[in-house]
Structure formats: C-alpha cells, structure tokens
Design a protein with these regions (language model features):
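Short hydrophobic/small-residue motifs within alpha-helical transmembrane segments
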Residues: 62-67, 152-153
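Conserved MFS/SLC helix-loop-helix module at the cytosolic interface between two early adjacent transmembrane helices
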Residues: 68-107
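Cytosolic juxtamembrane N-terminal segment immediately preceding the first transmembrane helix
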Residues: 1-25
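Hydrophobic core of transmembrane alpha-helices in multi-pass small-molecule transporters
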Residues: 27, 96, 107-123
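Intracellular juxtamembrane helix-capping segments at the cytosolic ends
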Residues: 44, 122-136
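Extracytoplasmic
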Residues: 17-52, 69-73, 159
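A generic transmembrane-helix signature of 12-TM secondary carrier transporters
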Residues: 90, 94-97, 112-113, 179, ...
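Helix-loop-helix hairpin linking two adjacent transmembrane segments in secondary transporters
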Residues: 146-147, 151-198
Length: 205
C-alpha cells in the first residue's frame, strides 16, 4: 500500500520533500535550456553574424558537451554533495545565458553553448536522480517518476514565458533575465530543501 508517512512517528518522510524540491528544481533547467533551444536559435539566426546552420550547430555542441560533462558529473556526485554540482551548473548556465546577448562570432557562440551544455548537465537530471536514489529504497521508481515530471512542467510554463520575454524585451535583454530566473529558481531550492542523504539528518531511507 502506498503511503508517504513514517509509521513510527506518523510524519511525512523527508524523502518526499526531496522529491517535491527536485520536481520544482528540474522545471528551470528543462524549461530554460532544453525546451528553449528553438527560441534561442531563432533569435540568433536573425542576427547578421550568424546563420541558421551555425545556430543549429551550437545546439549540437550543447548536447555534446552536456553528454561529456554528464559522465564526470555522474562520478562526482556519487562521492560528493550533489548540491555543489547543481549550484555550479546553475552558475555556468547563468553566465552562458548572459553571454548569449554579447556573442559576435561563431566561435564565441560555440564556446558559450559548450558552457551552457555543461551547466545544464551539472544542474539537472544527473544530480537530481542521484539524490532521489539515495533517499529511496522502496518506492524508488515512483519517486523518480514524480520528480522527473518537473522536466515537462518546465516546457509548459517557462518556455511560453521565455517567448513573451524575448518578444517584448528583445533577445539581448531577455537572455540575461532568463539566466537570472535559472539561477534564482535552482540555487535556493537546492540549499533550503535538499539534503545530501537520509543519514545526514538521522533518518533511514
């Protein structure tokens, strides 16, 4: 029978609070990076310095660097605090989004998107699923499923918001502001609600 309660003290198991926090946290990397590529691509391709081809290639670089970074992140978060990885990734993504407003050459664009991809990998699914796995032995699949739903929510809520910002403010103003939203949406949630492991607060998974 499914229950969120701890039988011994009739309190909600803190792991479910971790799930709720990760649900919220994943909304921002997915909505402001993964689902926003078409927005950024269209805005960049409209600039004289870039073509549709170079803008599209930058998205490929995002996924390439994200994949490579993910290999290192996966090993790192096994031994260290995933919140550090999440924070570092959010900061990298913030700087990448700010830099998108100032890139003038294709090389600069590729470098910025490489940083963006690394930031996405460090701040999203890998550290998040590592935390959920630490907190759940039973009901792990359900916990992971609930937490990862935040990925889809990002596309539903934050992508339309990004379109509105770009259309009303222009890309050069909107991109840094989107970076601020990424930063503010990820870091406070990580440090206020997430905990490294059940043992760190004296409970059993």
């Amino acid at each position: 029978k499914f229950t969120m309660w701890r039988e011994q003290d009739n309190q909600v198991y803190y792991g479910w609070k971790i799930v709720a926090a990760i649900f919220v946290l994943l909304t921002f990397p997915s909505g402001l990076s993964f689902y926003n590529h078409a927005i950024y691509l269209n805005a960049l391709a409209a600039q004289p310095a870039f073509t549709v081809g170079s803008a599209s290639m930058s998205v490929s670089i995002f996924f390439l660097t994200g994949g490579v970074t993910g290999l290192f992140v996966a090993r790192w978060v096994e031994d260290y605090d995933p919140r550090i990885s999440i924070t570092a990734g959010a900061i990298m993504s913030f700087f990448a989004l700010c830099a998108l407003a100032y890139v003038k050459t294709t090389l600069q664009l590729f470098l910025v998107y490489g940083l963006f991809g690394a930031g996405f990998a460090a701040s999203s699914l890998i550290p998040a699923t590592t935390l959920v796995t630490r907190w759940f032995r039973k009901k792990r699949a359900m916990a992971l499923s609930i937490a990862s739903t935040g990925l889809s929510l990002g596309g539903v809520i934050l992508t339309p918001l990004s379109i509105l910002m770009v259309d009303s403010l222009g890309f050069n103003i909107a991109a840094p502001l989107i970076g601020v939203i990424y930063l503010v949406g990820v870091i406070p949630v990580s440090w206020i609600f997430l905990r490294v492991s059940p043992e760190s607060i004296g409970v059993l998974p």
